[in-house]
Each structure stands twice: as structure tokens, then as C-alpha cells.
UniProtKB/Swiss-Prot annotation:
Subcellular location: Cytoplasm, Cytoskeleton; Golgi apparatus; Cytoplasm; Nucleus
Gene: Actl7a
Pfam families: Actin (PF00022), ACTL7A_N (PF16840)
The species this protein was found in: Mus musculus
Highest classification ranks of the organism: Eukaryota, Metazoa, Chordata, Craniata, Vertebrata
Required for interaction with TES: annotated span: 36-56
Protein name as catalogued: Actin-like protein 7A
Length: 440
């Protein structure tokens, strides 16, 4: 299977004619990866990890016995835990092979069984159990983990039920969102090493992984996911947190706003129907290039029909494009934060002149919410309008909804990355702070 489309992605430049190959950009070398090149490609799919107490190839000085079992080759697992979905698969593949909802089910007290062996968390396909009344909960809030016990249940399901692997036999690469607390990384290490006994792990900056999926080492990553949005400047592999922008609105807010618009037009949806509204959003909604002109189009031309699960048919009109205006006018959802385009320009203006010029031409769009039809073109129009003396360039990939995972797949496959794995023996010997020597 050819992976050329992943390792040398065809990146479409909005408003700039034919797509350009991302690999034609400047040198693919980054200080973070030392000699690692994104052109190393899929040949480096197997990862050296210690089995049991095996030593790393470039070991940290240890007081323990030097008699180690030999290294064995195994495939690394890449996991991207988002607010909406958790995506996972083996490093070296172009797309994640497994994707489940991050929302889990907790039995209501009246339906929960008594005894110590009762199941407390239902994950993935277990949610479709008609015999148990479940309360849906999400262990993440705006991209940040708030319930680690539930996250552990999700990972247990991913490893054992979805991928059907023994986690103690595979290195694991995890994505970490921008501006997350440092304790996130330490908790990940504790869970992976002490609960799942993984032989090695690495935690990578989420926006950096998104950038790698484009084949770049510098760029302005504009990421709009399910629970939070970010605008992250990255230079030669290094994120710039001091000028990173975070917006606490994203795809879930779009779903809620769409539901409110439909209810205002006479339909009857509640929070119990959010799954249906999510499907309506994905199938029927779009982003208008010019909402004022779009409103002038006769209403019947906007109408389409959507069939509900019970067979009933509803008609959708202008709410199909009005809902997405919240990204550019957050006051519509009672948010005091900047619009996505304004936040993007704000981050660019905080950069020095040389860096700003580089980032202007490398605006990289990522996240599932950017998959709405018309989203890239609208953002391009807004940025060009706000920066008439510059040439902002929005770049898009067809698979940008899985950009974080794909970047992790690329990174974990690079030969030059292999010394950056944190091994269990090193964690046991030096503690969680050893993470910061390899994960930065």
C-alpha cells in the first residue's frame, strides 16, 4: 500500500490555484528531531522497544544490573484522545484504524447492579445496550482531561476490545493539547507505565503533530475540534505558547447552536437528540462565503429534506449556514471571545516581521469542524480582508480531521525519533520528571 499521500501530502492552497506539494517547502529538518526527516517515510514502521527490563539503545546511566534482555521489534500505537472522539492505530499507517466516541455511559443508580463486580463504565459499542439506562458523560472539558478513571476505562476498551492487543507489548505515542497542565503528562505516564505496563511511551504536542501531517516544520496551526479551538504558531518544530490563542468554542457549540436554530423554526429537539443534530450538521450544513448575500437567496433554494431515525422527514433552510456564523461572530452563542479569524490575525501580529511573513503563507487548517463545506474558503476570505497588505494563505488537506493522529503516525515512524521514547525502566528509575528530557 502506497503512503505517498501521507508522507508527501498534497496540500491545497486556498485561493492559490493548483495544490502544492508540502514536501517542496523548506528543509524538513527540525532541531527537535535532530537528524529526523519527514522524508524518511513509511519504511521505518517498526519501533525498537524494550521487552520486560531491556535497556534502550542510548541508555541513561543506571545503577541497575547491566544484564538486560535483548531488544525486540514491535509496532508502536498512536492514540489521539479528543473531546469528541478517540482515534488510534499503529504507527506507519495513513489513517487511524479505530475511532470511538469519547463520551461514555454510566448506569443510573436505579439500574446499577449491586455488588463489587458491577460494570460502572460503558465504552464504544457497549453504549448500545438496551437493557441498561445510561447517563452519558465526557471525561474531557474543552480538551482537558477532568476524569482520569474514565479515561483509563476508554484506553482499556481501546487496547483490549478495539485493537485486541496487549499494551505491555507496544510503545504508545499520545497527543497532548496546547496549553494543557504539566500534570497531564505525568498522569499519562503513570497510567501507561503503572496500569498498562507499556514498555515505552512518548507524549507529543498536538499542534506539532497536526503540522507534521502537512509535511511542515513551521506554520500557524488553526485547529477547530469538538470541544476547543486553538491558533498555534510553530517555528522549526517549536510551538510558541506565549502567543498561542485558545477559544472555548468548537464543534459541540456549533451542534448546540444548530439545535437552537432548528427549535426556533418550529422543530423539537432536546439534548437527548444531540446525536441526531450532530448528524444533521455533518450531512446538511455548510459555511457561507458571504452570509449577507446567502440570505438574499430565496428560502426554497436552501431547503433540503432530512429523514429522522423514526422515518419522519424534516425540512432545513437557512439554519444550514447560519449556524456556522458563530465561528466568526461568537456573540451569537453569548461568547465574549474573539472570532476565529480575528484570533488568527491577532496571533500573527504578535510575531516579529520575519516570522509573521513565514507563517502567513503556512496557515494550516486542522480538526473535524473544519470539514464543513466552505470553511477553508470563508476563513481565507476573512483573513485576506483583515490583512490587505499581506498574503495570508490557508492550506488544507482532505484528511485534516485526523491530522493529529496522522502526524503522530509519521513521527513515531521516523528513524531519528526512536531515541526520544521514554522507557518504563527509565520512568521507574528516575520518576515522572524524566518525561521532560524526552517529551518537549
Amino acid at each position: 500500500m502506497s503512503l505517498d499521500g501521507v508522507w508527501a501530502p498534497q496540500t491545497a492552497n486556498i485561493g492559490d490555484g493548483p495544490a502544492k506539494k508540502a514536501s517542496d517547502q523548506a528543509s524538513m529538518q527540525t532541531q527537535v528531531l535532530q537528524t529526523a526527516s519527514l522524508k524518511d517515510g513509511p519504511a521505518k514502521r517498526a519501533v525498537w522497544v524494550r521487552r520486560d527490563n531491556a535497556e534502550t539503545e542510548d541508555p541513561v546511566k543506571s545503577t541497575m544490573s547491566k544484564d538486560r534482555p535483548r531488544l525486540e521489534v514491535t509496532k508502536a500505537v498512536v492514540v489521539d484522545l479528543g473531546t469528541g472522539f478517540c482515534k488510534c492505530g499503529f504507527a506507519g499507517l495513513p489513517k487511524p484504524t479505530h475511532k470511538i466516541s469519547t463520551t461514555v455511559g454510566k448506569p443510573y443508580m436505579e439500574t446499577a447492579k449491586t455488588g463489587d463486580n458491577r460494570k460502572e463504565t460503558f465504552v464504544g459499542h457497549e453504549l448500545f445496550n438496551p437493557d441498561i439506562h445510561l447517563k452519558l458523560v465526557n471525561p474531557l472539558r474543552h480538551g482537558i482531561i477532568v476524569d482520569w478513571d474514565t479515561v483509563q476505562d476508554i484506553w482499556e476498551y481501546l487496547f483490549r476490545q478495539e485493537m485486541k492487543i496487549a499494551p505491555e507489548e507496544h510503545a504508545v505515542l499520545v497527543s497532548d493539547p496546547p496549553l494543557s497542565p504539566h500534570t497531564n503528562r505525568e498522569k499519562y505516564a503513570e497510567m501507561l507505565f503503572e496500569t498498562f505496563n507499556t514498555p515505552a511511551m512518548h507524549i507529543a504536542y498536538q499542534s506539532r503533530l497536526s503540522m507534521y501531517s502537512y509535511g511542515r516544520t513551521s506554520g500557524l496551526v488553526v485547529e477547530v475540534g469538538h470541544g476547543v479551538s486553538y491558533v498555534v504558531p510553530i517555528y522549526e518544530g517549536y510551538p510558541l505558547p506565549s502567543i498561542t490563542g485558545r477559544l472555548d468554542y468548537a464543534g459541540s457549540d456549533l451542534t448546540t447552536y444548530l439545535m437552537n436554530l432548528m427549535n426556533n423554526s418550529g422543530k423539537h429537539f432536546s439534548e437527548d437528540h444531540l446525536g441526531i443534530v450532530e448528524d444533521i450538521k455533518t450531512r446538511c450544513c455548510f459555511v457561507a462565503l458571504d452570509p449577507i448575500e446567502e440570505k438574499k437567496i430565496p428560502a426554497p433554494e436552501h431547503e433540503i429534506h432530512y429523514t429522522l431515525p423514526d422515518g419522519k422527514e424534516i425540512r432545513l433552510g437557512q439554519e444550514r449556514f447560519l449556524c456556522s456564523e458563530m465561528f466568526f461572530k461568537p456573540s451569537l452563542i453569548k461568547s465574549m471571545q474573539l472570532g476565529l479569524h480575528t484570533q488568527t490575525v491577532s496571533c500573527l501580529n504578535k510575531c516579529d516581521i520575519a516570522l509573521k511573513r513565514d507563517l502567513m503563507g503556512n496557515i494550516l487548517l486542522c480538526g473535524g469542524s473544519t470539514m464543513l463545506r466552505g470553511f477553508p474558503n470563508r476563513l481565507q476570505k476573512e483573513l485576506s480582508s483583515m490583512c490587505p497588505n499581506d498574503t495570508p494563505q490557508v492550506n488544507v488537506l482532505p484528511e485534516r480531521d485526523t491530522a493529529v493522529w496522522t502526524g503522530g503516525s509519521i513521527l513515531a515512524s521516523l528513524q531519528g525519533f526512536q531515541p526520544l521514547w521514554v522507557h518504563r525502566l527509565e520512568y521507574e528509575e528516575h520518576g515522572p520528571f524524566f518525561l521532560y528530557r524526552r517529551c518537549f
